[in-house]
Amino acid sequence: MTVLVVNSGSSSLKYAVVRPASGEFLADGIIEEIGSGAVPDHDAALRAAFDELAAAGLHLEDLDLKAVGHRMVHGGKTFYKPSVVDDELIAKARELSPLAPLHNPPAIKGIEVARKLLPDLPHIAVFDTAFFHDLPAPASTYAIDRELAETWHIKRYGFHGTSHEYVSQQAAIFLDRPLESLNQIVLHLGNGASASAVAGGKAVDTSMGLTPMEGLVMGTRSGDIDPGVIMYLWRTAGMSVDDIESMLNRRSGVLGLGGASDFRKLRELIESGDEHAKLAYDVYIHRLRKYIGAYMAVLGRTDVISFTAGVGENVPPVRRDALAGLGGLGIEIDDALNSAKSDEPRLISTPDSRVTVLVVPTNEELAIARACVGVV
């Protein structure tokens, strides 16, 4: 069985051809600059992906494709497991777009294009929020007017769930321990960033909330913020709700504080003596450390902390600084292991560390492909 996985963003489209059973990738790639002259829209992007596959000798009709798997960020209360795409699903996903304005609309465009170009295959939507569907009520409930929250379905949904679930499973496999026996903290640190507490393979808390804006400081998003700031900007600075939303989503985080959302560029600015970049980094690390400590308290006993995604996997100083001085909590990392590079799961804690610290590469495309297996 082979699955085509499509992860459609506003300006890029990632694709992969995967054999779920073996984990083999026949091909993968990314089409960037959607909206430019060369790639004017998502239709052109997916056609370009097909052209790349054909150039590599992989023709769709010869691949034994059984399904097309799509990443969808927000499933709300309606979608909490992989679901066959139909017109009703698309309509409901579109209704949820205000809760994930950077993610759901381009994902819907990708799905619509793929259904048009591959009409004879089942299309499966895999939702970022699904892993957190059963969060305990104390973790998922906001302390606001209960009737208002129930009427408008306001709760913590959580995001990056496909990655958090996959990494927690891979950590257990790497350690050769039963998933059910482990209490884990997973830190998905990319341009978007989130933390989760996972007990026995089940999520018990996570940092993102109703939308992907809450929680950790991110590349362009603020993370946790006093709601009073929003009202203050609206009343005093004359900003509209749309202006504030755009600022919090696109011009905040380390970009808003330090002038760069890419950590390589941020490190260059810090090394050049840029004080704003240094503050952005310090705020990022401070927030990350707070969540690590909070989730250790939530879990009671922490067995494993795993770093994943672009920053988590590839920026050793972030891992070092996030865990520095936490020996009293049983966390000690080995500098040499932390600095080593590898594309495989690896240990970075010392033999004396009571908490095992890992770097576990995420693989959302493989996880999405495997999620399709039980549906088709």
From Swiss-Prot:
GO terms under cellular component: cytoplasm
Signal peptide positions on this chain: none
Pfam families the record matches: Acetate_kinase
Pathway given in the UniProt record: Metabolic intermediate biosynthesis; acetyl-CoA biosynthesis; acetyl-CoA from acetate: step 1/2
EC main group: transferase
Keyword terms of this UniProt record: ATP-binding, Cytoplasm, Kinase, Magnesium, Metal-binding, Nucleotide-binding, Transferase
Subcellular location(s) per record: Cytoplasm
UniProt-recorded Gene Ontology molecular function terms: acetate kinase activity; ATP binding; magnesium ion binding
Cofactor entry: Mg(2+); Mn(2+)
PROSITE patterns: ACETATE_KINASE_1, ACETATE_KINASE_2
GO terms (BP aspect): acetate metabolic process; acetyl-CoA biosynthetic process
Reactions catalysed, as given in the entry: acetate + ATP = acetyl phosphate + ADP
Ligand binding (ATP): K14, H188, L189, G190, N191, G192, D262, F263, R264, G310, V311, G312, E313, N314
Binding site for substrate: R71
Site (Transition state stabilizer): H160, R221
NCBIfam families: ackA
Subunit structure: Homodimer.
UniProt record similarity statement: Belongs to the acetokinase family.
UniProt xrefs under HAMAP family: Acetate_kinase
Function: Catalyzes the formation of acetyl phosphate from acetate and ATP. Can also catalyze the reverse reaction.
Official protein name in the record: Acetate kinase
Naturally occurring in which organism (per UniProt): Mycolicibacterium smegmatis (strain ATCC 700084 / mc(2)155) (Mycobacterium smegmatis)
